[in-house]
Amino acid sequence: MTNPPRILVVAGEASGDTHAAELVAALRARRPDLTFFGMGGARLAAQGVELLFDAREVSVMGITEVLPRIPRILQILKGLAEAAAERKPDVAILVDIPDFNLRLAKKLKALGVPVAYYVSPMIWAWRRGRVRTIKRLVDRMLCILPFEEDFYREAGVSARYVGSPVVEQVPSPDTATAFRERLGLSKDAPTLALLPGSRMGEIRRLLPDMVEAAKRLSAERPGLQVVVPLAPTIDREEITSRFEGSGVTPILVEGRAPEVVGASDAAVVASGTAVLEAGLMQRPLVVVYRVSLITYWVGRLMLKVAFVSLINLLAGRRVVPELLQGEMTPERIAEEVRRVWIPGAPREEMLQGLAEMRGRLGETGAATRAAESVLELLPPGRV
């Protein structure tokens, strides 16, 4: 009797874990006999994927931040390659984390394993030369942004635009009051959402200034609810400890970041996938980010686009403010939040821009279309 097709899945971010889990579910809906193993987080585990390594071990960003972790990251890379050599997967699905996954793709190519890459590296923004590596190592690039497919096809990469998985991960639009009721929050209190990221490095670098900004805004708005969605990669104490002595008591919600934004009057969001999720909730937001100086200057030299947030990149203009590096101060954060807190031209202009951005992301069904494309890579006789 022939063994069922086996698929290697590798995700390294909280968002990637979510996207990968939805793709696994879509694959299982079509082929219940498929088996999966690899690296990921809680959501892939909940889908029954056999996890050989925890995604949190490779979830780091920046040159100085990654250096201490290199030995362990290389060990995991070797472990996944050895597992692939032993188990002989019929296809591999690599999600995000390009510095890790492209190295793994090279090893998989040597083993003859077809590679589908889900959530493209942002090579159109920086390090464009990597498209040659992708052409050599990736059998199918599954694009989630509308302009990526043409970019890759012009470079000779087999690519398919499947749509943004974020579109179906966020709840349907509703009033802030309705979302507050769902989350058990006070319906009438002014509400500020803080989304500091899903990596520990982001919590350390970003949350203290977010807390200080929230303290200033709390002094101006009695009864302000400060709500923080807790990523599965972060321990609760890492959040609460950074509020100690601030006079602000955060309300922590397990996951449910889009709903937290939906419940807010405004949100402060770490640059990344969460910005797109927050924008789809049609609430005013301020994008913030800070990395080490070395990482920042290297990034400045290599960056080919004017913005860092996907909202502004998709719009081709500044829809939401981006406070980066030295501009990310409690004073500036509070100032930008005040500007869009109450009805008026700045708030309405931002909301209009967010609505336009939503229209460019297409319809739901990204995981379904991605699953169809992955199944096309199964070897003859395994389909």
Curated annotation (Swiss-Prot):
Pathway(s) the chain acts in: Bacterial outer membrane biogenesis; LPS lipid A biosynthesis
Pfam family, one: LpxB
One GO cellular component, as annotated: membrane
Enzyme class: transferase
Disulfide-linked positions: none
GO molecular function, one term: lipid-A-disaccharide synthase activity
GO BP terms: lipid A biosynthetic process
Record keywords, A-Z: Glycosyltransferase, Lipid A biosynthesis, Lipid biosynthesis, Lipid metabolism, Transferase
Reactions this protein catalyses: a lipid X + a UDP-2-N,3-O-bis[(3R)-3-hydroxyacyl]-alpha-D-glucosamine = a lipid A disaccharide + UDP + H(+)
Enzyme Commission number(s): 2.4.1.182
Sequence similarity: Belongs to the LpxB family.
Role summary: Condensation of UDP-2,3-diacylglucosamine and 2,3-diacylglucosamine-1-phosphate to form lipid A disaccharide, a precursor of lipid A, a phosphorylated glycolipid that anchors the lipopolysaccharide to the outer membrane of the cell.
Name used for this protein in its record: Lipid-A-disaccharide synthase
Organism of origin: Myxococcus xanthus (strain DK1622)
